[in-house]
Curated annotation (Swiss-Prot):
Protein name per Swiss-Prot or TrEMBL: Glutamate-1-semialdehyde 2,1-aminomutase
The family this protein is said to belong to: Belongs to the class-III pyridoxal-phosphate-dependent aminotransferase family. HemL subfamily.
GO BP: protoporphyrinogen IX biosynthetic process
NCBIfam families in the cross-refs: hemL, PRK00062.1
Gene: hemL
Amino acid sequence: MSKSENLYSAARELIPGGVNSPVRAFTGVGGTPLFIEKADGAYLYDVDGKAYIDYVGSWGPMVLGHNHPAIRNAVIEAAERGLSFGAPTEMEVKMAELVTNLVPTMDMVRMVNSGTEATMSAIRLARGFTGRDKIIKFEGCYHGHADCLLVKAGSGALTLGQPNSPGVPADFAKHTLTCTYNDLTSVRAAFEQYPQEIACIIVEPVAGNMNCVPPLPEFLPGLRALCDEFGALLIIDEVMTGFRVALAGAQDYYGVVPDLTCLGKIIGGGMPVGAFGGRRDVMDALAPTGPVYQAGTLSGNPIAMAAGFACLNEVAQPGIHETLDELTTRLAEGLLEAAEEANIPLVVNHVGGMFGIFFTDAESVTCYQDVMACDVERFKRFFHLMLEEGVYLAPSAFEAGFMSVAHSEEDINNTIDAARRVFAKL
């Protein structure tokens, strides 16, 4: 047995499913998950000593690549001053100033520890501010594992085939209305049915938890208009897209102004950080200035803030996002060309540093139904054959892939060459 197999066997006796987040168990593709020893740049190294070109990037945070020296040094320096204080620090102020400067729609920001905390807190705030209970989310979109959001969810919930999680009381779920992504008609119908009851829409501006599904041109502006018409708040969940699709996020890329924004992943540079923020009048409703309660023992942790501050300063450097887009476009075009040579029907969606691979005869993939019609079994074979070639993709047909600026042209070319060999075997 390999070291990964031995560790996985031991882990399953101690940790549910052997992992601390379900998708890591390779449930969506079968087989034994890799146990990682270290990572550097665009590469992961497993406990058996094999190197992989990494397109998971810790599920999004590693936009600069693994083990970036600026982030590593910031963490070491912060740790030498103490691990946690439970009191305000100067770095929290500097971090808030940086985030609000980079994302102009955020007048104020509250730091938390994860994307889930960010989304559940933003929804609570929207409900408190509007005095309404119902929310709209979209089928196949995932906004963390808060109870009200595990209704027709994407990401790991979709991978496990349980988009509606057991353990979520019906009384919670009844306030969550689910519409079809990229379909404004379904959203208007929900508002017309409950015109005075909907507090907010929460949406991934690029749906990255049913693989990678960009918005149609009219979709996000249409959501903004409907929220304005019916007095609801628009929450854009940029946990995945923030600082990746563009410096100011997908909201800037697509030209839509939310009331609240949720951030995670890149904002922590690999440390556990989330954030939510937006309009000053809405954020003023948050405790201690307002009645809507939210708190966290480790929120604004000094080490996490130092990592995030270092990461965002690097991400803000000129040329970063152009490089991400060029590398991702090169990969997408190369995969499509290789698939066509092998007569394999393939769609590759990509925006900025995100991409999604779909085995489908369809011309495009624009919604949950399109994703579910794709050939998941073929993806499983593709995943394992690429893994044998030393390419680590997301171990699920329902998860996006992520590029970093640490990936080289050689890495991209090697990935395309590997895919060409794999397509010949499918």
